[in-house]
A protein has these predicted regions:
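Short beta-strand/loop segments at the ligand-binding rim of alpha/beta enzyme cores
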Residues: 104-112
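Short, charged N-terminal beta->alpha structural module
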Residues: 24-48
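Bacterial N-terminal signal peptides that target proteins for export
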Residues: 1-10
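Structural recognition of alpha->loop->beta junctions
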Residues: 119-151
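A short, well-structured beta->alpha microelement
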Residues: 45-65
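Sec/Tat signal peptide C-region and signal peptidase I cleavage site
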Residues: 18-24
Length: 183
């Protein structure tokens, strides 16, 4: 009887682990600009009961069987320095990752959650690169104070969903992930 109970518990644990692993395989998350903002979106994903894989320096060959690439755009000189790369290397990294994601049939969600405080020359360079390759865009309203996201998303034909704050990204993120068959 004891062997049966232990086997049952182990089988149940393996089933739960497999289920969690399959959920984790649906979303991969990476910063574009090396700011810490991607970590905040990982927390939002947890609120949606989704374990996204966060890879700060994700490379094209690091994509697995995910359905969605979420890239959180905000430039950080400190973050780039800690990663040992410059803005040009970061742009090349993201081009490579996005090209590989698109080739695998993945959806690309670009997010900017830092508001006006995360905008500046460096971030704007990354925004110019990111918006045209997005399938959808979620932007905290303060981040579009000058209409840059609106202009770029209209030029690229990308739907932009606003959020009042980082906390308020939960609903638009949920909406996008449902639409894309992840939730």
């Amino acid at each position: 009887m004891r062997k049966f109970t232990i086997r049952t518990i182990l089988a149940l644990a393996a089933t739960v682990a497999f289920s969690t692993a399959s959920l984790a395989a649906d979303v991969v998350l990476t910063p574009f600009g090396q700011s810490p903002d991607a970590m905040m979106i990982k927390v939002v994903l947890k609120k949606l009961q989704l374990e996204g894989r966060l890879e700060k320096l994700l490379q094209a060959d690091g994509l697995q069987h995910e359905k969605v690439l979420i890239t959180v755009v905000a430039g950080s000189s400190k973050g780039l320095g800690e990663a040992g790369i410059d803005k040009d290397a970061e742009i090349e990294r993201m081009r490579s990752v996005v090209d590989a994601a698109k080739a695998k049939g993945m959806k690309v969600l670009v997010m900017h959650i830092g508001g006006k405080g995360r905008r500046g020359t460096l971030t704007d360079i990354f925004i110019d690169e990111a918006v045209p390759v997005a399938d959808k865009l979620i932007v905290v309203e303060g981040g579009d104070f000058d209409g840059l996201f609106t202009k770029l998303s209209q030029q690229a034909g990308v739907d932009m969903l606003p959020a009042a704050s980082v906390r308020e990204t939960t609903e638009p993120l949920k909406q996008v992930l449902i639409e894309w068959g992840v939730l």
